[in-house]
Swiss-Prot record:
Name under which the protein is recorded: Coiled-coil domain-containing protein 22
InterPro entries attached to this UniProt entry: CCDC22 (IPR008530), CCDC22_CC (IPR048348), CCDC22_N (IPR048349)
GO molecular function: cullin family protein binding
Locations listed in the record: Endosome; Cytoplasm, Cytoskeleton, Microtubule organizing center, Centrosome
Coiled-coil regions listed in the entry: 331-370, 459-541, 591-638
Amino acid sequence: MEEVDRILIHSLRQAGTDIDEDVQSVKQFTSELIVEAVVRCLRVIDPAVGNGLSHSLPPGMSARFRLGMSLAQACQDVGFKGEIGYQTFLYSNEPEIRSLFMFLVERLPRESAEASDQPAGKSVLLQRAIAAQIKAQLSVPWLPPTCRLPVHRKTQSSGPCHSFHAQPLSLPCSLKVSSRKQPKEVQEYWRNYLLPVTAQPSQPASVPASLLENHISELSAAQEWESEWNSQGLLSRLTPEEYRSRKKARLQKRIEEQLRTAAQPRPDTHGATRSTSDLAELLQSFGGASTGGDVLTKGTRFTHTEKFTFTQEPEKAVQQMAAAASALPSSQQSEEDLKAQQEAELSALQQQLQQLSVQMEEVGGGIKQLTVSIQQVTDELQTREVTNAERENSVKIKRQTIDLLPDAENNLLKLQSLVESSSKRVVQLASQWEKHRVPLIDEHRRLKELCSNRESESSRKLSEIKDLHDKIRQSAEEAKKKESLYKQLLTEFETLSKDVSRSAYTIRILEIVGNIKKQKEEITKILSDTKDLQKEINGLTGKLDRTFAVTDELVFKDAKKDESVRKSYKYLAALHENCTQLIQTIEDTGTIMREIRDLEEQIETENGKRTVSNLEKILEDYKAIRQENSALAAKIREG
C-alpha cells in the first residue's frame, strides 16, 4: 500500500492540494487535508460541482456537518458508488479514504503535455507539431484582410491555397533500366541539360502535385506489372525481358491489323471524306518496325509461323497501302447524301434480318418435328431388335431339340448324366464358395468395423478441428481486442506527464508480482500437503475402524466363555471411545484456533479504522456542540 499511497499523494499534489513532504501515506491525512484534497479533485473533474464547495473546514460544527454532507453528495454526483457520508470526512478511516481517493484520481483528466526530454517517434512528433500548428492558428482571431497585421497575413490569407494541378516531369531516377544501358547522348542530356524538378513545372505551386502524381503513376505501374507477372508471366516460362518484348510485339501486330482493317475499301463508304496518306505512312512504319530481328528471339513453331505470316517486305506493304489509298472514296459526295444512303442500307439490312429470322423460326420448327419422328423411329427399331433376338433364341433352342429327336434315348441318358454332373458341380462349387465365403464375411466384418472406427475417429478429429478453429478465431478476436487496448493504453501513456520516473513503480510492481507468485506457490504447496494429510488421515481412520471392527468381532466371540476376554473387550470399547473423544477434542481445538486467528484479524482491521480516535473526536465535537448550544441559549436569554 505504500506505493499506492505515494501515487495517490503525487496525483493529489498535481491536482493542487498542498500536502507536506512529511506526509507519506493516507493514514497521516487529517480531516482538513482530506476535505481540501477532495474539493481540489472535484474542481478539476467537474468545475460546476466543485466551485461551490469550500476547501477548508469551517470552525462551527453545524457548518462542518453541512460541508461533509455536501461533499458526500458531490462525490455521488460524479459517480462514486461506495458508502459515503459526513463521517467519511470528519471521522475517517484509512480504507474508505483510500478507495475514495483512488476513485477521484482515476476520474482526473489526463494531461496532454509531456516532458520535452522524453523520447518519441517521428510520427508522434509530426502529430504534435501538426496539433500545435492547428492550435496556434485556431487561437488567432479572424480579421478582415484590410485589418490584418503583416505577421497575420501569411497564416490568414488565401495565398497558400492552390488547386491540385499536376504536370509531367522528366525524372532519370524513375527509369527502371540502369543508366549504363542508356545512350551517351541521353546521359549527357540528363547530366547537363535536364532542368531540376522544381524548374520543370510552369508554376512553382504545381511541384508538389506533379511529384505526387508521378510517384502514384510509378507505384501503380509497378503494382500492375507485379500482378500481371504473377498471374500470366510466370505461366509463360519466359524471362521478364522476353515477356515484355512478346507483349510489345503482340500489341504492334494488333494495332497494325486494326489499322489495315480500317484502311481497306468498303462498299458502303463510297463518297466519304477522309484521307489515308497518314494511315499508309503509319502502317509502313509499323511494317518496317516489325521486321526487326530483336522482337522475337525465341519461341515455338507457332510463333515463328505467325512472324512469317505477318511480316512483309517494305515494298510490298507500300504497294498495298497505295492500292488501299487509291481505293478510298473521293470527297465529292456531301454528308447528307451519305447519311441518306446509310439509312437506306440500314433499312434494307433490317428487312433482310427480319426475313432471315422468320426463315430460321420455320427451319427450327421443322427440325423439331424431324427430331421427334427420328426419336420415335429409333425407339421402334430398338423394340423390334429385342423381339428379333428373343425369337432367334427360341428358334435356336427348337432347332437343337429337333436335332436330338432321332436318337432320343441316348440323348436323354446323356442329358441326365449332364444334369447329374452339373448338380454335383453345383454342390461342389457351393461347398467351395462356403469355404471362401466365411473368411470373406469375417474380413468384411473386420473392414466394416475398421471403417466405422475410422469414421468415428475422423468425426472426432473433425470436431476437434472445428473446436480448434473456433478457439483460433476467438484467440484472434481476443488478440485484436488486446492489440486495440494496447494501442489505447500506449496513447494514454504517451499523453501522461513524465515528471515522475516510473522505473521505481515498475520495479516495485514486479517485486509485488514476484511476491504474489511466491505466495501462490506456498499456498499451493500448503494445499497439496493438506490434501495429502487429509488423505492419510482418512486412510488411517478407515484402517482403524476396520481393525476395531475385526478385533471387536473376534473378542466378542470369546467374551461369553472367558472372563479375562470379557474384561479385554470392555477395555477395548473404552479405548475406542477415548480415542474418538481425543480426535474430536483435537478437531475442536483446531476450529477454535482458526476462529481465534479470524478474530485477531478482525481486531487488527478494527484497529486500522481508528475507532478509538474517532470516538474521541466525536466526544469532543459533542462537547463543542453543547457549548455552542449553551452559548446560543445564553444569547437568547439576554435578548
